[in-house]
């Protein structure tokens, strides 16, 4: 499925289905011995969406052999490391007194329910209306209760989401912790720049931001093809690589530095090692100069 201007989705189609796949890996990671992350709602959310290949992933029943890039355990480690990185951004910001958090393209993210937020924290979740409605209803049916004040902002990030965020009670005069997890790869180059411009315009001094540091050259080369192969082999009807926007673009880190942010990049290999994992050499070669990015606005 090739992307088009104005395309929409729910959690079983297009970009939305990738959020379900990531939640499936979080469910599997949560059941590992001595788990790096704990997402007690991921499994139920995946099953509620009902995509068979994602349910099989969550249950650990998918077997893809013969390629370290396609190994289920490796994919589980990757999502666990990624999830933990963004968890820690929010935890550190809260410890420093930040009481406003924004999750962009929140999908099946349950941090508003599973993290131990400081008293007085408001968490804003921004995503497509049908995605927000499904998750809110399903978690309510499960009896889940947010651990912070949760406010939903049902808007497409290609529309005027800053206005919708302010209408939901967001205060740009207060420092904010932002995450854009697994998002930039699905945006055209100019939309990525516009997103970072908007985040900056809404950020008071003391704000934090975390996202991926992507080597976008790899998507047009080997990695994009391999990711597409993996999605087909686990039973998806989508070629995930068709959802990516490839081509030349500003790196998020350089662009944010130009906007006045102090940027730190944690290479993937080091992020793995932080938690006792080893990034396979072939994955390291395919991922290129990729990792995780955190930024602080002084």
From Swiss-Prot:
Name the domain of life this protein comes from.
Answer: Bacteria
What are its E.C. numbers?
2.1.1.-
Residues given in the record as S-adenosyl-L-methionine binding sites: 127, 156-157
Q: Biological process (GO) annotations?
A: methylation
Q: What does this protein do?
A: Exhibits S-adenosyl-L-methionine-dependent methyltransferase activity.
Similarity remark = Belongs to the UPF0677 family.
List UniProt keywords, sorted A-Z. Answer: Methyltransferase, S-adenosyl-L-methionine, Transferase
- Disulfide-bonded cysteine pairs: these are none
Q: Which InterPro entries match?
A: Ppm1/Ppm2/Tcmp, SAM-dependent_MTases_sf, SAM_mthyl_Trfase_ML2640-like
Q: Which GO terms describe its molecular function?
A: methyltransferase activity
Q: Which NCBIfam families match?
A: mthyl_TIGR00027
Q: What is this protein called?
A: Putative S-adenosyl-L-methionine-dependent methyltransferase MSMEG_1480/MSMEI_1444
Pfam families reported for this sequence: LCM
């Amino acid at each position: 499925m090739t992307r088009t201007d104005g395309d929409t989705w729910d959690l079983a189609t297009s970009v939305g289905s990738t959020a379900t796949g990531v939640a499936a890996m979080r469910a599997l990671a949560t059941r590992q011995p001595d788990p790096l992350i704990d997402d007690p709602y991921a499994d139920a959310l995946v099953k509620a969406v009902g995509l068979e290949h994602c349910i099989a992933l969550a249950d650990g029943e998918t077997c893809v052999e013969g390629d370290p890039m396609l190994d289920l355990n490796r994919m589980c480690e990757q999502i666990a490391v990624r999830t933990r990185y963004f968890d820690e951004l929010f935890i550190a910001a809260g410890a420093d007194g930040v009481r406003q958090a924004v999750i962009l393209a929140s999908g099946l993210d349950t941090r508003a329910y599973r993290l131990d937020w400081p008293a007085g924290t408001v968490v804003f979740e921004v995503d497509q209306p049908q995605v927000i409605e499904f998750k809110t209803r399903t978690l309510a049916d499960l009896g889940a209760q947010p651990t912070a004040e949760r406010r939903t902002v049902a808007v497409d990030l290609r529309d005027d989401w800053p206005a919708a965020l302010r209408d939901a009670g967001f205060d740009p005069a207060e420092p904010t912790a932002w995450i854009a997890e697994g998002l930039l790869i699905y945006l055209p180059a100019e939309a990525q720049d516009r997103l970072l411009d908007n985040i900056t315009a809404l950020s008071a001094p003391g704000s934090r931001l975390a996202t991926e540091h992507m080597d976008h050259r790899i998507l047009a080369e080997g990695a994009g093809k391999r990711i597409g192969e993996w999605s087909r082999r686990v039973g998806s009807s989508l070629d995930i690589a068709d959802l990516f926007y490839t081509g030349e673009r500003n790196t998020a880190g350089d662009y944010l530095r130009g906007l006045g942010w102090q940027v730190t990049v944690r290479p993937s290999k080091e992020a793995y090692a932080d938690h006792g994992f080893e990034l396979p050499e072939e994955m390291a070669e395919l991922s290129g100069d990729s990792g995780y990015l955190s930024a602080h606005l002084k």
